[in-house]
Swiss-Prot record:
Keyword Translocase found: no
Subunit structure comment from the entry: Interacts with translational regulator CsrA and flagellin(s).
Organism encoding this protein: Geobacillus sp. (strain WCH70)
GO BP: any one term: regulation of translation
Family the UniProt entry places it in: Belongs to the FliW family.
UniProt-listed PANTHER family: FLAGELLAR ASSEMBLY FACTOR FLIW
Organism phylogeny: Bacteria, Bacillati, Bacillota, Bacilli, Bacillales
Name of the featured protein: Flagellar assembly factor FliW
Function, as annotated: Acts as an anti-CsrA protein, binds CsrA and prevents it from repressing translation of its target genes, one of which is flagellin. Binds to flagellin and participates in the assembly of the flagellum.
Coiled coil: none
Amino acid sequence: MKIATKYHGNIDIDEKDIVRFEQGIPGFLEEKQFVLLPLEDTPFIILQSVNTPALGFVLIEPFSYFPTYEIELDDNTLEQLQITGEQDVALYVILTVAEPFDDTTANLQAPIVINVNKRLGKQVILTNTNYKTKHRLFPEKVAK
């Protein structure tokens, strides 16, 4: 299947690689189908809408930048995503890419959770947490 993308141009994808977000993503509720596309030679992954070429979120696996990051998924999320164990889960966070890049932040309060076996995804909004929507990727660099 051919799709147009924000960062990769026109590409072929396999329909079995599509991740379905049954409830959409907050702010994009009508967007239900996405594909994960690695950005070559970077730790970044694009969560690309299959239907809207201009909609691509830059993601990272949070543990490289935030080694103590941990979340607990509620029973409702486990059921929605049909998660039976940790081996089912891939966890990402959305970046807000800034200029200069040192000012880039990660949304740790609303991670993207994907059941890699069932190809189901959800952006989970964490409550009762110290995580915020803007955590600097490079905290040792102080914003000017």
